[in-house]
Amino acid sequence: MPTQQCCVPRKHTFQLDELDRKLLDLLQDDAARPLYELGDLVGLSASAVQRRLSRYRSSGVIAKQIAVLDPDAVAGTVLACVLVMLERESKRLHADFRQRLLAASEVQQCYDLAGAWDYLVMVAANGMPRCRVVIDDLFLDAPNVKRYETLFIFEPIKRGLNIPLRQPDAVAKRRAASGGRR
């Protein structure tokens, strides 16, 4: 089973050229597109696309390719956002808390926050009873959790994991060329 990357900051960056940005934008929308189609869309051969994909994977730009399920299509899925405040601060206590989250398959995402709350945790569970058990197990009697607040999601307005890749100056140039229209 691959290691999950919950709340782990990245230490390096990858310099993207315009072809990289175009290709990665296409992949973020549909990673199952054939190489020849991706190549046609960005002006590269299928083998050149394959070389770039290999480079993205080896450098960590592409962390993994997965199938994203629609929670609405899977009967009984309950989504919740949990805000968590820790009692005490230390590297060890944060690491222990993060390990708890990494071990829970129902935790979809987690974010280390600045502000009143320490973490935002996204939970997906099969039904409300299971969601309550998961949240209670993770936070109710957890050592070092001072407070948590659960927000149940009625209706997702936008879902996505896409990272914006266009450079701000490119967007500004595009707007200027279109007469300022968005």
Enumerate the predicted regions with their spans:
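A compositional/biophysical signature of low hydrophobicity enriched in polar/charged and small residues
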Residues: M1-R182
